């Protein structure tokens, strides 16, 4: 990229960022006691998990008390997190690994995970770690689930009473009215089985029946494309965090990422970015997330708060102001 091009990109993005009254990224005051959160992630396949983690790390409203890996090669995912956290100066955040399983996807960022000397010799069990933290902080922890719900289903099976002591669960998952490729313009795409739900349907069914306050960020509100101009601006910042994101992005090997997962973090910090409404959602045996209003005279009680729409410009102003800040 030429110097003049880089300058032009910076001017364009800066104009974009200051075009909103919430562009400083600090739309909600930092509380005296930050929100305790655990992030459950399948980082290392798609790239959006890393972008979600970056936003969480740049949100002073959140206290990350641990990160758990889920789905497939959970140990390599944990090693990736070890390196990422060490390189950005946050090695103290605990990382726990879920039960390993035969991988169903290619770990696109494996070389990053296996590089350097950052991996810890052992990672605690994710389900045991999650339940231990809930017992330690009953009613205080928000669980952010941005991968298949393997650990969540196992935790419910092991100790449902303790699991119900979570403050809330926020998931990226489901497809209510819009499917993959439906960005709110162009030909509509019908609802589809969404990846995180589809890859552990029984665990998703258990979560929606668990009785824990549940907030759902489905495909309807999370198909957020990080275009070339915004990527160039973000990756040119030269901070340890943006440098790590840049390296993971290039190992991912595709061009334009869709930032599904970061909306879970953005919603917790600034709920106005993804307004929710109460719904009763049924997970069928094919992985569809079906809203069930019930008959008019006997409506079904809601089991989730669901976001069906978001404003991409507002989201990216919020995201870039946080993650691109030195």
Residue map of PLM features:
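Conformational coupling and interaction surfaces
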Residues: 31-34, 51-59, 63, 195-198, ...
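Short, mixed-charge aromatic SLiMs
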Residues: 74-80, 175-179, 283-297
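Metal-dependent C-N hydrolase catalytic cores
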Residues: 33-34, 39, 75-136, 302-310, ...
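Bacterial N-terminal signal peptides
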Residues: 8-19
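Bacterial N-terminal signal peptides that target proteins for export
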Residues: 1-9
């Amino acid at each position: 990229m030429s110097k003049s091009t880089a300058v032009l990109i910076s001017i364009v993005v800066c104009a974009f960022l200051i075009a909103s009254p919430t562009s400083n990224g600090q739309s909600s005051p930092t509380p005296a006691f930050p929100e305790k959160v655990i992030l459950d992630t399948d980082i290392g396949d798609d790239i959006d998990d890393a972008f979600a983690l970056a936003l969480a790390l740049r949100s002073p409203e959140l206290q990350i008390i641990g990160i758990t890996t889920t789905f497939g090669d959970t140990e390599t995912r944990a090693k990736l997190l070890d390196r990422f956290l060490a390189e950005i100066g946050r090695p103290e955040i605990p990382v726990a690994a879920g039960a390993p399983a035969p991988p169903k996807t290619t770990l696109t960022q494996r070389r990053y995970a296996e590089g350097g000397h950052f991996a810890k010799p052992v990672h605690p069990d994710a389900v045991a770690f999650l339940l231990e933290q809930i017992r330690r902080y009953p009613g205080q922890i928000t669980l952010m689930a941005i991968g298949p719900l393997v650990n969540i289903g196992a935790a419910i099976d092991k100790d449902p009473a303790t699991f119900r002591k979570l403050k809330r669960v926020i998931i990226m998952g489901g497809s209510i009215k819009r499917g993959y490729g439906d960005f709110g313009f162009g030909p509509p795409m019908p609802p589809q089985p969404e990846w995180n739900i589809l890859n552990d349907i029984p665990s998703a069914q258990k979560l929606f029946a668990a009785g824990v306050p549940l907030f759902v960020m489905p495909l309807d509100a999370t198909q957020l494309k990080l275009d070339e101009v915004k990527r160039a601006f973000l990756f040119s910042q030269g901070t340890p965090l943006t440098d790590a994101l840049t390296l993971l992005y290039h190992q991912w090997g595709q061009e334009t990422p869709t930032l599904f997962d970061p909306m879970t973090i953005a919603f917790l910090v600034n709920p106005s970015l993804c307004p929710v409404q109460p719904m009763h959602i049924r997970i069928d045996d094919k992985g569809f997330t079906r809203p069930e209003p019930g008959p008019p005279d006997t409506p079904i009680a809601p089991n989730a708060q669901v976001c069906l729409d978001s404003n991409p410009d507002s989201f990216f102003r919020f995201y870039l102001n946080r993650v691109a800040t030195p």
